[in-house]
Amino acid sequence: MAHKMNVESFNLDHTKVAAPFVRVADVKHLPAGDTLTKYDVRFCQPNKEHLDMPAVHSLEHSFAECVRNHSDAVIDFGPMGCQTGFYLIMIGEPDVSGTCELVETTLRDILKLNTTPAANEVQCGWGANHSIKAAQEAAHTMLNHRDEWEQVMA
């Protein structure tokens, strides 16, 4: 990388990370005094593996719904275009350990679901493109590596 780019993740050397992990991707201090922290919640090793779209889509719906049972600080949970993880945006200063606990609790909730929340054409733009089973498999794999989440670099 010759020069610093505007997008934080474009400055991350994806060949040097060891997924899965949770890391602070950005912190914004807003004019009114609030702080937003964006976390990179990485499920898959970049350029080696990825989540299939139905898994991504069901993880997005399930996590977004379940996480709000545990925290009012969640702003958004959205997928990365590369399909290797998600961005979790929260109100507050960075707290990787606390966020890892929140992610763990939420993924455990997802394992208990029978269906993907709002996976229908009334509540979703592509209601047929879901797989709760694939989402749960990805959640299970992520949870199996829980002790590694705070170690980002290989």
Curated annotation (Swiss-Prot):
It is an enzyme of class 4 (lyase). The keyword Iron applies. It comes from the Bacteria. Involved in the synthesis of autoinducer 2 (AI-2) which is secreted by bacteria and is used to communicate both the cell density and the metabolic potential of the environment. The regulation of gene expression in response to changes in cell density is called quorum sensing. Catalyzes the transformation of S-ribosylhomocysteine (RHC) to homocysteine (HC) and 4,5-dihydroxy-2,3-pentadione (DPD). Pfam families: LuxS. GO terms for molecular function: iron ion binding; S-ribosylhomocysteine lyase activity. Homodimer. Its cofactor is Fe cation. One of its GO terms (biological process) is quorum sensing. This is S-ribosylhomocysteine lyase. Its EC number is 4.4.1.21. Keywords: Autoinducer synthesis, Iron, Lyase, Metal-binding, Quorum sensing. It catalyses: S-(5-deoxy-D-ribos-5-yl)-L-homocysteine = (S)-4,5-dihydroxypentane-2,3-dione + L-homocysteine. Fe cation binds at residues 57, 61, 124. SUPFAM superfamilies: LuxS/MPP-like metallohydrolase. Gene3D superfamilies: S-ribosylhomocysteinase (LuxS). Belongs to the LuxS family.
